[in-house]
């Protein structure tokens, strides 16, 4: 429990600093698509169509990181600059969820580690991720860069967690839900930055290889 307390103490100032974040550079370059859609259709929900339009445009004009571009375009400040802090909050929560869930799956589901020991290790690993990031300013508090790298890394960890759980799942309902979640997260991860996408592919191939070997040994 002490490690969990340290994790909480480490996160409090990181979340507190989000209120000082402001839009910068590419936040405007991508956010203008969503803002233009909102002004044209006079609907806050039109930002989604603007994000889809930006993803499609950049696919042909720049690169195929469609899910990153989709989230980049939905910069919270397109609905008002006072909402920009929600972007860094979202990034921090994604990394927190991804790290805690992935380490839980590895330690508890794969290695069958005892609950409290596992929780302590999860907390320590997560603290290290937050504390030793190369640039908190760019990784957490600049929405455009943060969502493209740190946020997508969080999605990637969630995808791998679901993939491992799917390989070990029993029952049609559990398998169906995990399969649906894995497809959705795979689509997001595939359109993220190239490093995360490549890591996800290599890890997925490893999971498939291990599952094939285990299945053959059973039979």
Q: Each predicted region: which residue ranges?
A:
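Transmembrane-helix motifs of polytopic, lipid-linked glycan transferases
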Residues: 90-116, 158
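Start-transfer (signal-anchor) and selected internal transmembrane alpha helices
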Residues: 1-12
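Perimembrane helix-loop-helix junctions
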Residues: 199-219
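Juxtamembrane "helix-exit" motif on the non-cytosolic side of transmembrane helices
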Residues: 75-79, 104-108, 131-141
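Membrane-interface micro-motifs in multi-pass membrane enzymes
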Residues: 26, 117-167, 193
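Extracytoplasmic catalytic/substrate-binding loops of multi-pass membrane glycan-assembly enzymes
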Residues: 17-40, 44-50, 59-71
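Short hydrophobic/aromatic helix or loop-helix immediately within or flanking a transmembrane segment
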Residues: 56-90
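Membrane-interface alpha helices of multi-pass inner-membrane proteins
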Residues: 177-200
């Amino acid at each position: 429990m002490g490690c969990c307390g340290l994790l909480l103490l480490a996160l409090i100032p990181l979340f507190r600093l989000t209120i000082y974040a402001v839009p910068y550079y590419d936040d405007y370059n991508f956010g203008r698509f969503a803002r233009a859609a909102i002004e044209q259709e006079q609907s806050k929900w039109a930002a989604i169509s603007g994000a889809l339009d930006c993803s499609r445009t950049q696919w042909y004009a720049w690169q195929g990181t469609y899910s990153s571009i989709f989230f980049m375009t939905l910069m919270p400040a397109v609905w008002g600059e006072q909402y920009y802090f929600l972007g860094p909050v979202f990034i921090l929560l994604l990394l927190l969820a991804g790290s805690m869930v992935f380490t839980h799956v590895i330690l508890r589901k794969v290695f069958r580690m005892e609950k409290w020991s596992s929780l302590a290790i999860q907390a320590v690993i997560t603290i290290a991720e937050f504390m030793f990031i190369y640039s908190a300013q760019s990784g957490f508090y600049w929405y455009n860069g943060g969502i493209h790298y740190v946020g997508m890394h969080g999605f990637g960890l969630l995808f791998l967690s679901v993939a491992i759980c799917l390989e070990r799942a029993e029952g049609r309902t559990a398998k169906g839900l995990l399969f649906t979640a894995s497809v959705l997260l795979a689509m997001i991860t595939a359109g993220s930055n190239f490093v995360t996408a490549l890591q996800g592919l290599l890890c997925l191939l490893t999971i498939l290889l291990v599952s094939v070997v285990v299945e053959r040994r059973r039979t």
